């Protein structure tokens, strides 16, 4: 409610990761984390705040800080379903309107794909959208993080993310990096590497989300 009072309508929270080592998690148990994140999400809904479930499909098993380096989480898909993705699945399947975002992290989940999650069609389109049923806005974590920049240039990472099913590309700090990501996507559309239909679908999801919040 305080965020709404001072004029904010978006918050990149809550953190749904289970037991991440640097203190941003609600806890080390999926049910416990689910309970607290559901309460947080209902509070954001009541205040009309657009929020973001992060960092899909869960970073609790990571042993590094993705701001600085890449890491491969080797848990199987079955383990991810039984543990890390439970809080995400709880919100996605139990909230009537999917008028929130899911933020996808940059780590690699070998049980799902060999690519970082934020540029993986397997993680985003197949797992998050088709299997878990999320049809709302997908946003990347900050694309300037070392986990992604260690593998991709800025002009190519945005294109790869949109191809994977991302709607919003988050580049937080450097204007030159923002321009490189933008120009990469623009050039990809001009050369038909990306379709205008994909861009239009993302725009529709974003506008629909805003309208739902305005009407709540």
Residue ranges and their predicted role:
Residues 205-213:
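Core structural elements
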Residues 192, 213-214:
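Short glycine-centered helix-capping/turn motifs at secondary-structure transition points
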Residues 13-21:
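Short, conserved phosphate-binding/catalytic loop or strand-edge motifs used
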């Amino acid at each position: 409610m305080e965020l709404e009072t001072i004029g904010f309508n978006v918050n990149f929270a809550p953190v749904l990761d289970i037991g991440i080592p640097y203190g941003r998690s609600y806890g080390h148990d999926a049910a416990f984390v689910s309970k607290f994140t559901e309460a947080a999400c209902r509070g954001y809904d009541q205040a009309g705040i657009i929020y973001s479930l992060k960092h899909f499909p869960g970073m609790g098993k990571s042993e590094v800080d993705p701001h600085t380096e890449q890491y491969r989480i080797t848990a199987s898909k079955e383990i991810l379903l039984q543990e890390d993705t439970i809080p995400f699945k709880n919100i996605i399947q139990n909230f009537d309107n999917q008028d929130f975002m899911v933020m996808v992290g940059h780590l690699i989940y070998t049980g799902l794909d060999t690519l970082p999650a934020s540029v993986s069609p397997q993680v985003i389109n197949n797992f998050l959208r088709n299997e878990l049923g999320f049809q709302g806005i997908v946003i990347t974590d900050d694309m300037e993080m070392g986990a992604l920049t260690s593998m991709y240039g800025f002009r190519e990472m945005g294109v790869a993310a949109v191809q994977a099913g991302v709607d919003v590309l988050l580049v937080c700090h450097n204007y030159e990096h923002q321009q490189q990501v933008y120009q990469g996507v623009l050039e990809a559309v001009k050369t038909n590497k990306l379709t205008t239909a994909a861009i239009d679908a993302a725009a529709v999801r974003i506008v629909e989300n805003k309208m739902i919040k305005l009407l709540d």
